[in-house]
A protein has these predicted regions:
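ABC-type nucleotide-binding domain
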Residues: 5-266
Length: 266
């Protein structure tokens, strides 16, 4: 590791306390072999401590956008900065420590609840684990298990419900104390009350955790500091919920279609 970096960049990169958490400057992404770009000319700034929503229809580019933040892919055009530095200056291992991604499909391993959470950080104390479980709205169901943290987990978490698995993977990400947490539709198996409690607990965490919430549900993003609205790889809206209802037809359409179904009530 570090072989592809100039010598002065190989050491641990100190977090630049002056920089914004994430900055996209005219970013486009075309996957190898694809004719059309998956993202075109995306620019936004996420300040430290903000919650950023990302919404759009299927295939609008939501997952492509957030895949650039942990550098699963590199932008084809434009630049991405993390904590005030160009993303390519970070050794990938350092970046993975700063950016935690929780996917919709929760990945759990055979073992115990504790051993799964310790993937987030091998040095975490039980107090750290319980704090992460509280924030992730998982403490209650873990406490209800006969063995608590030592409760067995089957490979893939087969002995847990979808919502329990998702909450444990969110807790595991929090154990690593990242600077940036990305929830990629990862609250989709949670009911509204739990989803709302999770968002509230994340917002109340001390420090400057920046949270990206990718969701199909407008209701999940109503309290975000900024919402990025994507349509066919382009950013068609950027603002808060109330602003976007006025200014962004794509957002308004998503919200109203869900509201009519009773989805957006809470």
């Amino acid at each position: 590791p570090g072989m592809d970096f100039p010598a002065e960049l190989r050491s641990e990169v100190p977090a630049d306390k002056a920089g914004d958490a994430v900055r996209f400057d005219h970013v486009s992404l075309t996957y190898a072999g694809a004719g059309a770009p998956s993202l075109s000319d995306i620019s936004f700034t996420a300040k430290r401590g903000q919650t950023i929503g990302v919404i759009g229809g299927t295939g609008s580019g939501k997952s492509s956008l957030i895949s650039l933040i942990p550098r699963f892919y590199d932008a084809t055009e434009g630049s991405v900065e993390i904590m005030g530095r160009p993303i390519r200056q970070y050794p990938r291992a350092d970046l993975r420590g700063k950016v935690a991604v929780v996917m919709q499909k929760a990945q759990l391993f055979g073992g115990t609840i504790r051993s799964n959470l310790l993937w987030g950080s091998q040095n975490a104390s039980d107090a750290d684990l319980w704090a992460a479980l509280e924030t992730a709205q998982a403490a209650e169901f873990v406490k209800a298990k006969p063995l608590g943290l030592d409760e067995p987990v089957e490979q893939g978490g087969r002995n847990l419900s979808g919502g329990q698995k998702q909450r444990l993977t969110i807790a595991r990400a929090l154990v690593g104390k990242p600077d940036i947490l990305i929830l990629d539709d990862s609250a989709s198996a949670l009911d509204y009350a739990t989803d709302a409690a999770l968002r509230k607990a994340l917002a109340a965490l001390p420090g400057d955790l920046t949270v990206f919430i990718v969701s199909q549900r407008a209701a999940s993003l109503q309290h975000a500091d900024q919402i990025i609205v994507l349509d066919d790889g382009r950013m068609v809206g950027l603002g808060r919920h109330a602003e976007l209802l006025e200014s962004c037809p794509v957002y308004k359409e998503i919200y109203e279609s869900q509201f009519k179904k009773g989805d957006a009530q809470k």
